Amino acid sequence: ATRCGLLIKGGLFLEEARKLTNIGLDKTGTLTKGEPEVAGITLLGGADRKQVLSLAASLGAMNKHPLSAAIVREAKKEHAEIQPVADFTALPGEGVTGRIGTGRASLLNLAALDKRGLSSDEVADAFNRASENGMSSVALADTFGVLAVFVMADEIKADTRSGLAQLKAEGITPWLLTGDNERAA
């Protein structure tokens, strides 16, 4: 185990590990590189790309989620302004929201958009296209509707496939743990 970078304290745990039949693996950072990038932005309703990046990065800068960090990196590459955010709130399993200037903006997943009545066929199609290609999505919305859908890609590590095959060969069934929807996963 130590040759693989694992520290397991106590022989009992090593002995018990040989009885494993299932293992849960987190996707981000375990099976993927854990450094998602913005692969595309679908602008909706005539939204301005730089303004969308500014709003999304302003919210993202308040959050430690890897997708937020990717949006902040993209905004910095495009020299979009990161603005102060007031009343920032993390919405577990949904996204984040806060007040920027005089308006409220949110970064939300599709379920959260549906829950708030903000989704549309166009928004759902953007999310579905991303998930069909194995990518994640997050939408930027204001009080009037969805401004953009960010498509995020996180590269699979080079040794992931062989590692999963080795687990299966040992009779261990790997399970994927992720916040993504099933198709993206």
Language-model regions: role of each:
Residues K9-A185:
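Cytosolic catalytic headpiece
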